[in-house]
Amino acid sequence: MKNLILIPLFTVAAINPVCAQKAPAHIRLTEQSMMHESRVTPSPLNGAMVDDRFVSFQWPLPAEAQSDGAPMDGFEHLVKKIDKSKLAYKIRYAQDSTFRKGCFQADTRWPFYNPEKPLSLGTWYWQYAYVKDGQPQWSETLQVEVKDNGHRFCPPSLKEVLACVPLSHPRVWIIKDEWDKFRKESLGKVERAWYLERADKVLITPMKDVKDINTSQVKNLTNQMQINSYLTRESRRIIDAEEGNTEALIRAYLLTKDRKYADEAIRRVMIMSDWNKNANVKGDFNDATLLSLCSMAYDSFYDLLTSAQKKELLDDIREKGNGMYNHFNNYMENHIAENHIWQMTLRILTMAAFATYGDLPEADTWTDYCYNVWLARFPGLNKDGGWHNGDSYFTVNTRTLIEVPYYYTKLTGFDFFSDPWYTNNVMYTIFQQPPFSKSGGNGSSHQNVMRPNSIRIGYLDALARLTGNTYAADFVRRTLKSDSLYLKKALLAKPGDLAWFRLQCDKPLPDGPGLTALPWGYVFPETGLASFQTNWDRVGSNAMWSFRSSPYGSTSHALANQNAFNTFFGGKPIFYSSGHHIEFTDVHSMLCHRGTRAHNTILVNGMGQRIGVEGYGWIPRYYVGEKIGYVLGDASNAYGKVISPLWLKRGEQSDVHYTPENGWDDVPLTKFRRHIVNLGNTGYIFIYDELEASEPADYTFMLHTVTQPMSVDKTDKRYIHVQGLSGRGGASDAYIFSTGALQTDTTSQFFVPAHNWLRADDKGNFKKYPNHYHFTAKSEKAKVYRFGTIINTHAVKYPAKAPEILEDGRIKAGGWLISVNLKAEGAPSFFIRSTKDKVSITYKGQETIVDENGYVTTMRDKVPELEI
């Protein structure tokens, strides 16, 4: 039997009919967005209940300090200047609503506050205040109920952490008192040999120079965005290479205490320390890299450095660290997710802060901020463990997600990985990309993630050891059985090398239930993701589908793919999101990769979904069972003109025009709900689309493939048959039924060609991007329209059998009988039952009811718990 314990089913069992009548079946959201680029609500929300972790108080910035930040790297000069030294806040909290008894009050310079001790159980009242001209302007009184679910995450206070920081150096990558023991225990580990092998090569490799940055293509670029992006990439090519080389030398010294590694590393760091002053060095990642090298050299070589070298390094650390702190504070703690800070730069400032704590006065502030903002906002954006930026950019956060909490754990002895987010994140990491399989197809650059890379496997390896998760352990074992040196591929990878962690952590991979004990599907309602499988044991026989309808919309690295699905067989994509991520706001990337026309969803009057948090969807209902699964996505509010100030600025700076000609305009859409029913582990899914508008509109159903063209068969007038192929023995056959006649088209051309002006190899050769394949089925104009689609994903060697339409109008497919209302009249509805097992699903325009083995689950809409 599949393990269903871990699946958080947001459903309501039909036990109490009185209570059931009180909850509306449908919730129609009217908010312009579910999330915000910058916080607009306090946390915890008024009336909230917190039972899984300590309470961190957070609130919006004052209006005069609110900012979306720089639209992109290189445009920081466009951000309004804020004198952060004038920002001040107060907070008070008590179990007395009048704040007269037992009131705790504090001053803070940031818009959040973590109590030094976890709040006791019960009802608490709290207020925050903006301090202006010395006078506090108090908020309304807010209330929070504190409970304990038995696994409450309550980490130590900053005061307790700082008491554990050693006075000696090194203290970050290794603690001096543990150094000799660490060196001895590393002798039998392969990671030690890897680092020494790389370091020995570096010793005989000439160092690159900042003058080697290639600027030859600048003359061919058309706007400042392209110039900044190109120089950022080319300067990172030099600086990242030298970071890897120098980091290998530092780690080799820590492993051996051999001066040859230290002397060469010190020489290189002293040369690189001011490379940020070169006009061709662009981007905050380069600044952070240089801070990392300076601070790790200072800490690791402390006993070898001269007084002059220490002073020079401390001066560099002060300059770069202050620049980062001044950017972060009173900004990132309120921001939905400042990409680069979350990915790497907060980690780097954190390590620099602890490396220089006690040696630099500024480090007192940095440690305070870095530790407390971690407690308040990190490690994840929400509780469900999903990552809204998608499959490719998730791995850029790897070192941050492991190294920062592992350092705090080593310092204090408190298990920072007991944060429940990590348990949920294992499920995201597994379900969105099973072993040896293509990624789920979400987020910028997902096209490049052909199988779980070595960084992702290293991350699962770390979480398996740290949390005892046996599913992650099985995933890792299966991968390393195929390639025992697979983890070496991540050695010194900037965002994701965890070889040093494995040298430090002696916990073994745990034994226990493996992937075959997992359920067929998993849903992340806060992130807005779902995926289902048919075979955890043999990827070659696995039919998978993924789905997204997300409150995060299409901001950051997320895509405008609300209510979109992808299909896979044998780990290869079939019906799959199209387009190429050339650059964050490149015209092709925006119109043909981020934009809605690139995805397996719906266009309304030819228009796509908004760019930004305003183009959102959500998952009101879902069910994961042994014999049936179900997800309902709602993208009713996703469409319209782009109105995000941040994305309008980005478009302006990148020559991206949000016009009707390019696919953005107001539309009369009032409802777009997509139901997907997973028909057991047969490889069949049923999709039912409810579309309504305030005036007649046309609706375009889209499918895309990225490896081979689709075939379209309209022989049977009752449906359109579209077949997509993986090119590796897999197929998805889609049978599209609809309210009326459809006008179809196929093309192998992008709306805007994929022109690579950015990504050249070391020899200056620019990679060519292939075209993809696109199918559209456009309806006549109507106020109400419905699509019903059956998709069978299978091995090509076992050809699909067309659905059988019975005399009474029911459809028979894959051992299931389907009744569906495709007419514009009457309530939207479907009824599906298995011909083999006692399982069915019913929808008649209100509740969704699943009957599985005699247990009835009635689902009504539930809004996911969100903040920001």
Q: Which role does the model predict for each range below?
A:
Residues 581-868:
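CBM-like, beta-strand-rich accessory domains located in the C-terminal region of large
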Residues 26, 144-174, 712-713:
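Low-complexity, Pro/Ser/Thr- and charge-rich linker/hinge segments at domain boundaries
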Residues 23-75:
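Pro/Thr/Ser/Gly-rich low-complexity, intrinsically disordered linker/stalk tracts
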Residues 356, 396-574, 780-786, 803-868:
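Carbohydrate-active enzyme catalytic cores, enriched for enzymes
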Residues 195, 227-438, 445:
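Aromatic-lined, polymer-binding surfaces characteristic
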Residues 133-149:
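Extracellular fibronectin type III
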Residues 69, 73-121:
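Recognizes extended acidic, P/S/T-rich segments that occur
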